[in-house]
Every structure is written in structure tokens, then in C-alpha cells.
Amino acid sequence: GTIVLPDSMNLVAKVDIKGPEYKAGLRLKEGKGAMDVNAALNTSTEVYKADLKIGNLQLHNFLPKDSIYELSLSAAANGRGLDVMSYHSFAKLNLSLDQLHYAKYHLSNLNLTGDLKGALVTAHLTSDNALLKMTTDAEYNLAHSYPDGKITVDVTQLDLHELGIMPQPMKRPLTFNLAAEARRDLVSAHFVSGDMKLDLSARSGVNPLIRQSTHFVDVLMKQIDEKALNHAELRK
């Protein structure tokens, strides 16, 4: 949408450079809302840090054509090394979403922590609000040329009616648990929701599995077009 700069906005920015050390600061004030950003980088050591604080900022004043309103959040990051695939790089991230009003949705109590060490990224995400109560843990190895990671998602409450997916309120909120893993020669997934259970396991990596699945679909669609199913060919 169109970005508008409100007349009531006040912006102050500061940049300081001393040899390999770079520092920057920014403060934005608009009505009752404010945003503060501070960042520092040493290009010699590749050590960096940054923090962001947004309090009750009315985003609709900047994006009047979009249905996005109040935002409050805080974030902090620090680390060393600009090559995320290097085993010598490390980083930490903490993000907390205190309030986000988008359309009819009100999100709050959303927290994300992330770490990078030895090319391994780990993340922990929690959500505790009326729309979604959830915990997610994930990890992914950036150094490998093939997908290599795992994720677990535990949803204890998901309101599909409030999200506009279900026309009527549900008697009980949706809950489910998902655990998935991808390695060089293994892909597995386990899904449980109420009485429904689904398990997937393949003795191949993600890329070979995608190629095999694509080939299977191509052969199947060809047989459907020719109106002649060949089960032996499909099993190859």
C-alpha cells in the first residue's frame, strides 16, 4: 500500500563512524507511539549488536490503505561473523511481540528466540493469545547442501472461527502436534490431532523424495489421460 509520513511525526537519526566501528541510532515519535533503534558494527572483528523497541506505534497512520494498526514489540540481536555458514560465526536473537492489531485480529504474547552456532540455527517460538496457543522448536544446518533439520509444533488452541476459516464457533478449539525431520537419507513426519494420526517416513532426503513424487504424479496423470492405469509402472 501507499506509505504516508504523518505531519505529527518526529524523526532523529545519528551515525557515528570511528575507524572500523560504526554506530547508528534512530528515534521516531508519532502521536503516542515511538520507535527506537540502536545498532553497532565493528568491521574488523565482525562483532555486531542491534536492538529495536516499538511502543504503541499506530501503523495505520503510515499505511492508511492497509488494515494494520497498533504495534508494540522489542527485539535484540548480537553476534560475531557476517558469514552465517561459517562454523566460527555465532548470533543470538530475542524478539517479543506485545501487541499487533491487524484487521480484526489481535495478536499478543508472541516470543521468539534464535541462536546460530557452528552453522546450526535453532529457534524457539511461543504464542499465548486468544487466537493461538502454541510452542514451536526448530533447528536447521546451514552448512549442508541438502535440507537438514527438524521441527516440532505443539498447538494447544487454534481458533479457526476467529481466523475466518470456520463459519461457526467450534465446540472445542483445534489442537494438534506435528514432528517432522529431514536428513540426508531420511524424511519423516508425525501428526496427531484428536483421534487422527498420520505418519510419513521415507528412506531418502527431501530432494530425492520431491523428484520421485514429481515423477509419480507425471506418470499417474499420463495414465489418467490415456485412461489406462498401470500399477506396476506406478510402483517403480
Describe the residue ranges of each PLM region.
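Interface amphipathic segments
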Residues: 1-236
